[in-house]
């Protein structure tokens, strides 16, 4: 079985492409079914295992399959599923086989591949991806083991290194950018659109600045109100956004919508109503919540998740010692996992050996029963049974020895000596 990871991330593709390749949560299970259908007709042991990880910064397909053409098939499937021309997608896609796939999974879960070095959110996202794949019935022995090892490695890295210390989060970066536009965030009205984990983090950082007003707009009114109350703010219906957008100086949006919820026309009207006072907007969603054309307006300062990444990277350089320590841990764990994977590769051989040996045993036992039934001497029958089993079980190894030549024969003799502990060493044999 071969492990393979296919994906794009913030290192290889801009947000404009990442949002087109993203999988909304409700689409992941159906997508896994369509991916497995690519391999329809394969016998059950060869059917692929698969899991999809889709976040703001990456979309990745983890799979385990015996299909030699899996790499090309997976890339073609991703291209077809999202209706993106293959020649447009391919330059941004990475395909990582075997140990590279294992190393990548370990690095991602440990926060080493994140835009925010050492961030913990990705670990929860990966666990959710595994849970979804499990519910979809697309996990098996290999990916289950990979992800269990992945979570253990992430725990070890975070527990024994300072990889997450003093990190500049996306939320903190948003506040820093806002302070470049508005000298005092405390004098501004702030609107958060959405009520998920990222918005909660942003609200925490902005609330610490003591803004003039903090408002949360969310599709689920109850959840929005609960978040607003936590930070001493208030909630408003998302449907009121077009009519009230002009009231806010800072707007931070991160929803799970598959289409933009803030269009160019609505922002143009808001700017006009504000008499061209600036609006600072942060779009942390992938796919984006705010139409990119909004960024061209004169009095609007629009930043995406990629723009915030530049600020985040400034804080990453100071933790290179922790990175080196984490990479060393990961490399050791990759080797351990590959040893397990190599050991798994001989399981079918061992199973076949047991099946063959058991078939021989059954045949000889049946023959012995017939001999006893016709009145043959029991001692003679037992002797014949043992002789027949011995001859048939060593027939394969002795035939291989007789066919081998030169160095191959010497290696095979040493190998057989390991099987049969009391065999003489090859150097002690006078006649080969």
Swiss-Prot record:
Assembly information from the UniProt record: Homodimer.
Keyword field contains Iron-sulfur: no
Alphabetical keyword list: NADP, Oxidoreductase, Porphyrin biosynthesis
Positions bearing the site annotation: Important for activity: 104
Catalytic residues of the enzyme: 56
Domain notes: Possesses an unusual extended V-shaped dimeric structure with each monomer consisting of three distinct domains arranged along a curved 'spinal' alpha-helix. The N-terminal catalytic domain specifically recognizes the glutamate moiety of the substrate. The second domain is the NADPH-binding domain, and the third C-terminal domain is responsible for dimerization.
Functional description taken from the UniProt entry: Catalyzes the NADPH-dependent reduction of glutamyl-tRNA(Glu) to glutamate 1-semialdehyde (GSA).
Additional notes on this entry: During catalysis, the active site Cys acts as a nucleophile attacking the alpha-carbonyl group of tRNA-bound glutamate with the formation of a thioester intermediate between enzyme and glutamate, and the concomitant release of tRNA(Glu). The thioester intermediate is finally reduced by direct hydride transfer from NADPH, to form the product GSA.
Cited PANTHER family: GLUTAMYL-TRNA REDUCTASE
Protein name: Glutamyl-tRNA reductase
Residues noted as binding NADP(+) in the record, renumbered to the chain: 194-199
One GO BP: protoporphyrinogen IX biosynthetic process from glutamate
Entry GO MF terms: glutamyl-tRNA reductase activity; NADP binding
Residues binding substrate: 55-58, 114, 119-121, 125
């Amino acid at each position: 079985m071969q492990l393979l990871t296919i994906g794009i991330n913030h290192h290889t593709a801009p947000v404009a492409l990442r949002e087109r390749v993203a999988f909304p949560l409700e689409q992941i299970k159906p997508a896994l079914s369509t991916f497995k259908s690519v391999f329809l007709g394969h016998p059950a042991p060869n059917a692929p295992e698969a899991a999809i990880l889709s976040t703001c910064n990456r979309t990745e397909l983890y799979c385990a399959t015996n299909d030699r053409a899996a790499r090309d098939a997976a890339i073609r499937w991703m291209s077809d599923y999202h209706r993106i021309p293959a020649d447009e997608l391919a330059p941004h896609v990475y395909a990582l086989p075997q140990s590279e796939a294992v190393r990548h999974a370990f690095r991602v879960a440990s926060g080493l591949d994140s835009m925010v070095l050492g961030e913990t959110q990705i670990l929860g996202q990966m666990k959710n991806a595994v849970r979804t794949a499990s519910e979809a019935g697309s996990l098996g022995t290999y990916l289950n083991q990979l992800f269990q090892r992945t979570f253990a490695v992430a725990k070890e890295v975070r527990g024994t290194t300072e990889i997450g210390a003093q990190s500049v989060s996306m939320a903190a970066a948003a506040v820093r950018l806002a302070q470049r536009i508005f000298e005092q965030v405390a004098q501004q009205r702030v609107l958060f659109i959405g009520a998920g984990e990222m918005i909660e983090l942003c609200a925490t950082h902005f609330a610490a600045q003591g803004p003039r007003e903090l408002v949360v707009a969310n599709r689920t009114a109850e959840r929005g109100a609960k978040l607003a109350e936590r930070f001493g703010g208030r909630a408003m219906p998302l449907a009121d956004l077009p009519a009230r957008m002009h009231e806010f100086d800072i707007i931070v949006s991160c929803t799970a919508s598959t289409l933009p919820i803030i269009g160019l026309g609505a922002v143009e009207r808001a700017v006009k109503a504000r008499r061209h006072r600036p609006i600072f907007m942060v779009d942390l969603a992938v796919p984006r919540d705010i139409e990119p054309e909004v960024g061209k307006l004169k009095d609007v300062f629009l930043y995406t998740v990629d723009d915030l990444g530049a600020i985040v990277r400034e804080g990453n350089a100071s933790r290179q010692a922790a990175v080196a320590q984490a990479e060393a841990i990961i490399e050791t764990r990759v080797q351990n996992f590959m040893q397990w994977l190599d050991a798994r590769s001989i399981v079918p051989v061992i199973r076949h050996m047991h099946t063959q040996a058991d078939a021989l045993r059954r045949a000889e036992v049946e023959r012995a029963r017939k001999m006893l039934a016709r009145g043959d001497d029991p001692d003679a029958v037992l002797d014949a049974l043992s002789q027949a089993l011995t001859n048939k079980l060593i027939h394969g190894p002795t035939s291989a020895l007789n066919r081998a030549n030169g160095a191959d024969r010497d290696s095979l003799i040493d190998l057989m000596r390991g099987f049969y502990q009391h065999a003489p060493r090859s150097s002690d044999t006078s006649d080969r």
